[in-house]
Amino acid sequence: MNIFNPNHDRKAIVIFSGGQDSTTCLFQAIAEYGKENIEAITFQYGQRHAIELEKARAIVQDLGIKQTLIDTSVMKAITHNALMDEQAHIEQKENELPNTFVDGRNALFLLYAAIYAKGQGIQDIITGVCETDFSGYPDCRDVFIKSMNVTLNLAMDYQFNIKTPLMYLTKAQTWQLADELGVLDYVQKHTHTCYEGIEGGCGKCPSCILRNKGLKKYLTQKGRKNV
């Protein structure tokens, strides 16, 4: 897995939630661009797992990365889903999107990130979306990202480059990437993934299950290679 591609003459902004995927992307971006060329942008959209905002703030402070926090909580007034309703039971019915899907979330994140990036003279936008081990969210697909990239370029007459380093990685491979970057323990200890907002994870929600299953698979594979 090629993780180092020195690109220190450019700047990049990472859409950063404080979760496993975006934190792994942040570390990879630091390796590729240099810490001084990286910024993080985080969104407060009324998520029930607001603890991730605390994790995000702690991580960027620890790493010395500039963070911009954008309030998009107006979304709660126009859409309903289990990720923004603490009383809703998280579930996925057959042949339907999970009720944790937030309509328009990634489109909005990319739009605001692009507006900010252009103002800072930044072209590269990094997001940790993935369509290999994902929950069926349509806005995590590569076809959407490519479409959004074209739309933003046309909308602002600016050459954005949306990068998705995790797009075709399984969750186990994302853990592998963190390990290759030398930050597996850091990601495991300091990031938050749980939809329920429970410190350390509930172990039962789809996000926790995917995270834990991926870690177990990677560590098992790593153990076999070291035998």
From Swiss-Prot:
Keywords: ATP-binding, Ligase, Metal-binding, Nucleotide-binding, Queuosine biosynthesis, Zinc
InterPro entries in alphabetical order: QueC, Rossmann-like_a/b/a_fold
Domain of life: Bacteria
The protein's enzyme class: ligase
Metal-binding in keyword set: yes
GO molecular function: ATP binding; ligase activity, forming carbon-nitrogen bonds; zinc ion binding
Biological pathway: Purine metabolism; 7-cyano-7-deazaguanine biosynthesis
Cofactors, names only: Zn(2+)
Binding site for ATP: F16, S17, G18, G19, Q20, D21, S22, T23, T24, C25, L26
Residues bound to Zn(2+): C194, C202, C205, C208
Reaction it catalyzes: 7-carboxy-7-deazaguanine + NH4(+) + ATP = 7-cyano-7-deazaguanine + ADP + phosphate + H2O + H(+)
Keyword Transferase: no
UniProt xrefs under HAMAP family: QueC
NCBIfam families linked to this entry: 7-cyano-7-deazaguanine synthase QueC (TIGR00364)
Family assignment from sequence similarity: Belongs to the QueC family.
Name of this protein: 7-cyano-7-deazaguanine synthase
